[in-house]
Amino acid sequence: MSRILEGDPVEGEKSWENELRPQKFEDFPGQDDVKEKLKVFVAAAKHRGESLDHVLLCGPPGLGKTTLSKIIANDMGAEIKMTSAPAIDKKGDLAAILTSLKPHSVLFIDEIHRLSRHVEEYLYTAMEDYYIDIVTGEGLGARSMKFTLAPFTLVGATTRAGLLNPPFRDRFGIVERLQFYDKDALRQILMRSAEILKVEIDEEGAEEVARRSRGTPRVANRLLKRVRDYAQVKGNGVVSKDIAVYALNQLGVDQYGLDLMDRRILSLIQDKYAGGPVGIDTIAAALSEERDTLEEVYEPFLIQEGFIQKTQRGRVITEFAKSSVLADK
């Protein structure tokens, strides 16, 4: 699945995402509560000459978990190694990474909830006591050797913290949840990105793009690039409110930040199931979509913005959705 409002990175975005990524806490707009706490924790660890406690960053995709991990490493003056859970298939894969870490390095694991159980459990002693057991040989000749690791900080990023086993989750001394950004923070991000990308944009244009960006910086930056194209071809090169409205309407992003799939979800619940409640598996089957995709990609924003409610009996359309999005049909 690839959509312009997708929070996960899509193919080809890595290079310009890195260009736009803040390198310091001071350049990171939004998430003030999380940011201020991390600054204190990092400063205290540096003062003691220790590695920072292990950090778990939770929240929907595109909110800055990877960026914060890099800022933590930069602020600590530490090396960072980056990987993702699907790339760590076996204990040996993890052992190779852990044994290569320098003192006080940061190890970032994206999608950490997708680690297999045996790999997850292999991290326990590494996180608590900085050692792992390495098995050499096979069969009756196999023996276990204790390998001491350099002190390090594990930073895990997850969109589904509830899937982590409690013993694993409890080993993170710092657990923070990132929230969707407000429009002012997104406007600041857009103005900064426009300056880096050399895009002419006025305040009203930035506000309009921010309003439709689903509270997600990655989406905001992606929309900025597409609106820039319309400004260059259909306008005078400046991203104004008028050109932003025109471009985003052409891209199928409405005034609420919803796209066609979002509206299909809402219409399905309202029209086919009388507003709900309806189970997530039923919705997934009706839309020919994966349950995980609905729960991780679409639902967080729809719930956050008050379009649907999640109940024990299923999903329910809210009065706000009926009087806004669905009233515009």
Swiss-Prot record:
Recorded GO CC terms: cytoplasm; Holliday junction resolvase complex
Chain spans, region Large ATPase domain (RuvB-L): 1-181
Catalytic activity, reaction form: ATP + H2O = ADP + phosphate + H(+)
Region ranges (Disordered): 1-20
Family that this chain belongs to: Belongs to the RuvB family.
Record text about domains: Has 3 domains, the large (RuvB-L) and small ATPase (RuvB-S) domains and the C-terminal head (RuvB-H) domain. The head domain binds DNA, while the ATPase domains jointly bind ATP, ADP or are empty depending on the state of the subunit in the translocation cycle. During a single DNA translocation step the structure of each domain remains the same, but their relative positions change.
Name of the protein: Holliday junction branch migration complex subunit RuvB
Encoding gene per record: ruvB
